[in-house]
From Swiss-Prot:
InterPro entries: Hist_DNA-bd, Histone-like_DNA-bd_CS, IHF-like_DNA-bd_dom_sf, IHF_beta. This protein is one of the two subunits of integration host factor, a specific DNA-binding protein that functions in genetic recombination as well as in transcriptional and translational control. NCBIfam families: hip, PRK00199.1. This is Integration host factor subunit beta. It comes from Photobacterium profundum (strain SS9).
Length: 96
């Protein structure tokens, strides 16, 4: 599902809200989530999951075009861990 598809689905369910209001709300939520992660904080949405940062250590990579070795710096990457309720719901839907 894309962001546009999410907006369309929410608009069809929440007919009292305009598409612009739904789009603005989603953009605001995502912006706050990105800002929270950028500050190094964790986000927990009970029943859904949590977002945190994982550190990837520096390593030696390879340029796929030339095959040359490249030093890659360490970095933080966003990580999502699904909650138990979400895992159970997905597994039940797929198993059915």
């Amino acid at each position: 599902m894309t962001k546009s598809e999410l907006i369309e689905r929410l608009c069809s369910q929440q007919t009292h809200l305009s598409a612009k209001q739904v789009e603005d709300a989603i953009k605001e939520i995502l912006e706050h989530m990105a800002g929270t992660l950028a500050e190094g904080d964790r986000i927990e949405i009970r029943g859904f999951g949590s977002f945190s940062l994982h550190y990837r250590a520096p390593r030696v990579g390879r340029n796929p075009k030339t095959g040359d070795k490249v030093e890659l710096d360490g970095k933080y990457v966003p990580h999502f861990k699904p909650g138990k309720e979400l895992r159970d719901r997905v597994n039940a839907a797929i198993a059915a």
